[in-house]
Amino acid sequence: MQEGSLCSISRKKTLDSDYVSKLKKSSEQGEGGKFIRQPNRFTTPFGDKEGELKVEANRYRLIWAPVCPWAHRSIIVRSLLGLEDVISVGTLDPVRPDKEISDWAFTLDKDNVDPVLKVHYLSELYLATDPDYKGRPTVPALVDLKTKKVVNNDYFNLTKYFETKWTKYHKVNAPDLYPIEKREEIDKFNDDLFDKLNNGVYKAGFARTQEAYNDAVINVFKKLDELEERLEHSRYLFGDKITEADIRAYVTLVRFDIAYYNAFKVNLKRLKDYKNLWSYARDLYQTKGFFDTTNFDAIKKHYHICCVPNPYKILPLGPDLSEWNTEHNRDKREYK
């Protein structure tokens, strides 16, 4: 599909008019103009107990959009743990089919249809699961191939299920991304990381008052400063091995200069202005599972076409992406 037509594809599958109206009017604004992210609707965990999702090879399809940091981290973990052969993937177009509707489309696939699920839009899967669903259809969305229904869109915990419940399918010598002796500390760290940085950039970008925007931006850069200091003392956030925390930090950092800096006005500093953070981000990017799942083109398109007024769909030329492949030296440093 040509780039110019990405925002104007026709909706080949007619959705319930009331649902479309809800999507158009969906608001995640709180008191004082603050952005309040909608809760996840499908949060059933994986496990052996009654009512929990069964761990089963080739039963689930992971729907993602390369632009979304929450979905990206699930794809990174899937790759690092070697789950590619047991969990299939469906990929959504980086540009929404209708700027006024918070939906995602399978327009990268032949005939604009996911080849396995046979749907045009992510919202079709959400409505098939819950006909009364009125929120935004979001990614990652894990779909049960037996029922063609969304069984989990809990981005905050999905990676941890892959790390702890899918171990029998992990590849030989898979990294321990969520070491049991550090889980409590990692969870506490990740909670604050999400509030101040991961979701913090969205709090800034979708703020509706100056005060809400200012508060969000200040918190974003306080957290970046904290990470900069922490990374002076270790190669990764929790020592010399990649953990769940690094993946969660990476998906925001890799989008920072190319998207958030301009689109969400988090522009006090660039990632490149931080010595440790910039080398750390390059270190992760140059690791298999990170660079091969990072789509800069998709990220740039989504945030500059769908998230800000841009009627002519003009994309910035920069930043220079070749710098992501420059030497980082974090593997050669001595840390104290």
Summary of predicted features, one role per range:
Residues M1-K336:
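C-terminal alpha-helical interaction module
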